[in-house]
Amino acid sequence: DTGGLNIKTGTGMSLMKKDMGGAANCIGLAKLVSDVGIQIDLHLLLCLVENSISKKSMRPSDIVKSREGSFVEIGDTDAEGRLILADAITYASESKPDLIVDMATLTGASRVAMGIEVPSFFCNDDDLAMKLIDSSKRTGDPLWQLPLWDNYSNQLNSEHADFKNIGNSVFGGAITAALFLQKFAKNTPWIHIDLMAWTRANKYSSYEGGEAMGIRALLDFFKRF
């Protein structure tokens, strides 16, 4: 992820090899479910994209049509992950699932709020959210709920399309990203996890690299779903 035409700095790009962490965690979760033998019908969708620069690059203010049919104005080309997630959520919804879970290294705003060790999550069903919080506590696998605060949704307003792919404020970026995705989940029960998927050396370990985050809590949650 270079950021596209809204290009990142060199420092901002330096760790982007870990930007596939959401997909990696989903693969890890699917393997856990298979190894444990939980009897659920699990469909794994991997949203894979390279965000780079070419003569075909998407431009700020371009308007694209989503799979769901709505038109999205590109406010920032570095907010590409939510575009492919939106189409995947729409695709998943077409089979009328009982639940959709997405995991993504989506926003720096979540890292600012939570640090790198605690993923944030959003959910459109309060009962499911409480069960996931309980599973997080039971497994010691941290997840922290942030609100789908509807009063921020007007930050996504567009004069030229149905909405933009990014909010017009420097504040609450993790929330507005989740509100964008919620437009595609609609009434399907849905959990969105915004994670770092990477750890740095700390007082407990000298290891630095990819990190499984939230999948133990989700495994426990699936057992009781």
Kindly give the residue locations of the regions a language model identified:
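A generic structural signal for tightly packed, nonpolar segments enriched in small/aliphatic residues
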Residues: T2-F225
